[in-house]
Swiss-Prot record:
Signal peptide: none
Coiled-coil zones: none
Top enzyme class: hydrolase
Superkingdom of this protein's organism: Eukaryota
Name of the protein in its database record: Methionine aminopeptidase 2-1
Phylogenetic placement of the source organism: Eukaryota, Fungi, Dikarya, Ascomycota, Pezizomycotina
Natural source organism: Blastomyces gilchristii (strain SLH14081) (Blastomyces dermatitidis)
InterPro entries in alphabetical order: Creatinase/aminopeptidase-like, Met_Aminopeptidase_Type2, Pept_M24, Pept_M24_MAP, Pept_M24A_MAP2, Pept_M24A_MAP2_BS, WH-like_DNA-bd_sf, WH_DNA-bd_sf
Compartments where located: Cytoplasm
Amino acid sequence: MAAQVTPELANLNSKPEGGAPPKQVPVKDVPENEDVESDDDNEGDQGAGEPGSTGAAKKKKKKKPKKKKKGGPKVQTEPPRVILSSIFPNNDYPVGELVEYKDDNAYRTTNEEKRYLDRMNNDFLSEYRYAAEVHRQVRQYAQKTIKPGQTLTEIAEGIEDSVRALTGHDGLTEGDNLLGGIAFPTGVNLNHCAAHYSPNAGNKMVLQYEDVMKVDFGVHINGRIVDSAFTVAFDPVYDNLLAAVKDATNTGIREAGIDVRMSDIGAAIQETMESYEVEIKGTTYPVKPIRNLNGHTIGQFEIHGGKNGKSVPIVKGGDQSKMEEGEVYAIETFGSTGRGYVRDDMETSHYAKVPDAPNVPLRLSSAKNLLNVITKNFGTLPFCRRYLDRLGQDKYLLGLNNLVANGIVDAYPPLCDIKGSYTAQFEHTILLRPNIKEVISRGYDY
């Protein structure tokens, strides 16, 4: 649930796949460590009593049995359904993109104390890399298969079913989703809608060829959240819009680092994005950063970093605070052909329990019961109405609205620019490790 809005705006079943069995495809970047016995030493073996032999029959050379391959299967299916721990049985998940610190922080790459501190974070890194590899495999399949004519519900649930399968947490038993799985509702945001749109039950909206769709989803293992997003467009007329935002996000990632000021990152992002323009139906539009959407810190089980969370602007000015060692950030940028400013619009689907929610006596029994379900299944992780439906909850809207009214649950309505405009988004999660920056969600796709 990547988008974090500026304060002024903030105040305003897993289903089995039918048809043929899943296709198996190789998993990229998986090291092959198996030792397979060569068959070369069987060459030239001769059977006993061959024609023309004059002596005793030659003894047949004993074949050595081939060693069994170690570990689990080395392939993923299409759609992704193989739990990742069976593909990486030793929890040796792929490393993200490693970027050495520069300038005054260049010493961190070789400093022994920093390297020692980094080695202490093995569990932290393993959980993050697990979540990141799930994200990569799920999104890369989604990018290949998302097509015009699909409903937004089909797209969102396809992604969610894959995340649940690869993490091994279907979220149907109490507390299971807190161990791992979906970190927040899958955003499938069309055109002028930039963020926080996920279909509610009964939604029949269909993806069209001329649409620009932002796909934003999160994966977590033990509350270590990987937040990453990409944009899908079928008409090449939007290529420059997507290129502008992807370039701006990569600029933000490049500039981010320990002791870097947030305002400096925002200025660099804005300069990059505004260097692009896009022509649509004969009209040329400058690509504008959406100035009231930001990147953000990520905390354990808290997508926006909790009480002491920080924002990463995508325009110049503003926050003078600095990034610090050990922090986790979602670096995301949004570009628009509209005003470059979003407002709440359309029906709400995203909700999250407030981490330090007030202890308010609830009069509605439906609100009390729903709060218990939310706490035990999502904690402070965001959820949507479809997830409550999936848990068998019904007639819960009155109770949900009561929790929102009492400040116990926050509602996150869709965030939209002016109608007729087009918006794009790209996002990655980065770890500011003591000795190196790791773009944990980086893949060959973006």
